UniProtKB/Swiss-Prot annotation:
Pfam families: Tex55 (PF17819)
Biased composition (Polar residues): 104-113, 147-163, 292-302
Annotated InterPro entries: Tex55 (IPR040760), TEX55_DD (IPR048377)
Low complexity bias (residue ranges): 307-317
GO cellular component: nucleus
Protein's UniProt name: Testis-specific expressed protein 55
Region Disordered: start-end pairs: 1-176, 292-317
Location (main, coarse): nucleus
Biased composition (Acidic residues): 134-143
UniProt KW keywords: Nucleus
Keyword Endoplasmic reticulum: no
Subcellular location: Nucleus
């Protein structure tokens, strides 16, 4: 009695499940057909029981195989994703099938171990190849993602920069547009450089003008601070030689008269209570001579040299008196000496120092009034 082909290959390889089912069904039919033929020939009852038991075993095996194949199909996606779990499950199923087959089959039929090792090696190789392919694809995808993201980000930043500068737009693929943008950029840079050059030239000229104005002002100040030379005319230098000798003699006689009057007043108005103080008046008229300028009408003919003799005769008839210019210091000095003012103040100060009154102003006024009284009395006598 022939048995169907090796069932372990059908259980291990999922792609051959429909062929295995077909072979199992055909084997069961052949067994029934053979059993009927043996019965018609006139076999014994034990052979009929054996055929019926084999048919029942074949039907049970086909039902079990269909259920196991459905489980394998449902677990295929998870097995592909989890290779270790799929290997363990496949090994468990193979061991269970082998144990069931050994119990159901006669002892003379044994499975070849070489075929099992071959199928298990193929399955392991396919699973390892699939896992390596998936790992390689994931690594390549991971490598591609950062490079693509960096390229995209760099292109995006470049586009934003161009948009900010104003010479890159959405339709930048046009080469003419790019050349126009470059030309605009060049013109803009040229305009900026020309503007800076204009500023430099302006400030340079301004600094030059300021330096020139400063030098001009310094020169003007230097010229203004310089001393101008003085020029004396001959007429002014010769004026001292024209001083009249008569005025010198008159001034000398007046000074002598003042000296005599001063001595007479000091002797007559001396007081017993007052301390003796020498009353000498020093004048600076002895070493220096008083110079007076006299302008006469003798200078008039100088201006009338080209005029007629009749005009010169009329001018000689109307001569003005000489004009004398005196020094104000000498005039004040003569006034003080004439009224004896120095002697009066000398007496008042001497009395003030000697008496030391509480009210010096009132004391000085009282002294002046007493002097006025004495003068009036003297004049009346």
């Amino acid at each position: 009695m022939d048995e169907p082909p090796d069932e372990s290959l059908n259980h291990e390889n999922t792609t051959r499940a429909p062929d295995n089912e077909k072979n199992n069904i055909e084997g069961a039919g052949q067994a029934l057909h053979r059993g009927s033929e043996h019965a018609g020939v006139g076999s014994s009852e034990p052979t009929g029981d054996k055929v019926s038991g084999q048919a029942n075993a074949g039907s049970r095996q086909t039902g079990r195989r269909t259920s196991e194949e459905a489980e394998q199909r449902s677990s295929q996606p998870t097995e592909h994703r989890l290779p270790g779990h799929a290997e363990r499950r496949a090994s468990q199923q193979a061991e269970r099938r082998l144990s069931e087959r050994r119990t159901s089959q006669p002892p003379n039929q044994q499975l070849p171990s070489h075929s099992e090792r071959k199928t298990s090696g193929k399955i392991d190789g396919q699973e390892s190849l699939l896992s390596e392919q998936t790992d390689q694809e994931t690594s390549e995808f991971d490598d591609l993602i950062p490079s693509a993201s960096t390229d995209y980000l760099s292109a995006r930043s470049q586009q934003q920069e161009y948009n900010q500068h104003g010479y890159w737009t959405e339709d930048s693929s046009d080469p003419h547009r790019l050349s126009e943008d470059l030309e605009k950029d060049y013109t803009r840079v040229k305009h900026i450089t020309e503007k800076q050059a204009g500023y430099r030239s302006y400030y340079k000229t301004l600094a030059h003008i300021e330096s020139r104005t400063l030098t001009d002002t310094n020169d003007y100040r230097e010229t203004g601070q310089r001393l101008q030379p003085c020029t004396f005319e001959d007429s002014e230098a010769e004026l001292p030689s024209k001083v009249s000798t008569t005025e010198e003699t008159e001034s000398a006689t007046t000074i002598q008269a003042y000296n005599t009057q001063d001595t007479e007043l000091t002797t007559s108005t001396s007081h017993e209570k007052l301390p003796s103080i020498t009353t000498k008046v020093y004048y600076s008229s002895s070493p220096e001579k008083i110079q007076t300028t006299e302008y006469t009408s003798d200078t008039t003919p100088v201006f009338d040299q080209g005029r007629s003799s009749q005009r010169s005769s009329q001018s000689s008839r109307w001569r003005f008196p000489p004009i004398v210019f005196e020094d104000p210091y000498h005039v004040a000095l003569r006034y003080v000496e004439k009224h004896n003012i120095l002697h009066i103040f000398q007496q008042i100060t001497e009395n003030l120092v000697y008496e030391r009154p509480d009210d010096p102003l009132y004391f000085m006024l009282d002294q002046v009034q007493n002097m006025i009284k004495h003068r009036d009395e003297r004049q009346s006598d």
